[in-house]
Amino acid sequence: MYERILVPTDGSDVAEAAVDHALDLAERYDAEVHALYVVDIDSVNFSLGTEQVDRLKQGRFDEMGELKERADEATGAVADRAGERAVDVVEHVSGGRPHKVIGDYAEEHGIDLIVMGSHGRAGVRRALLGSVTERTLRSTHVPVLVVDYLEED
C-alpha cells in the first residue's frame, strides 16, 4: 500500500508525534521513510542579510553552520529512530515555502503518503495562525495523514 512515506520535521514535539506514526506505518508496510527539513525562506528573509538568503535559495545549507546543524539534528533523529526499527530512511534539507516544498518533494519522489503533525488548535486561533499542515493539505494530491498533538497543561 505504501512504499515511500514523507515526514516533514523540524525536530519539534509536534513533528515527533508524526514521526512515530510514519515509522509505525513504514514498519508495517516495509516502506521507506523520507525525513524532510524545510527552511522557510520567507520567515528568515527578515533576520538574515542578502548574502545569507541567497545561499538559502540556492540550497547551500552546508555554508550555514547553525542552520545545517539544526536540520541535520532533526532529520538525524528520524534516521536514528528508523534504524532502531530497521526502516530505511532518506534525509533531505530544502529551502522555500514549506507547503510548496513538501508538495513538490512528494510528487518528485513518488511519495505515497505524507505524515504531518499539527497543534491541536481550534476555532479562531487556528484560523488566525494558519498552518503548514493545512496549506499542504490544500495544495497536494498526495494523501496526507495529520497527527494531532495536544500540549499538556
Task: Describe each model-derived feature in a short phrase.
Residues A31-E32, V87, I111, V142:
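Short glycine/serine/threonine/alanine-rich loop segments
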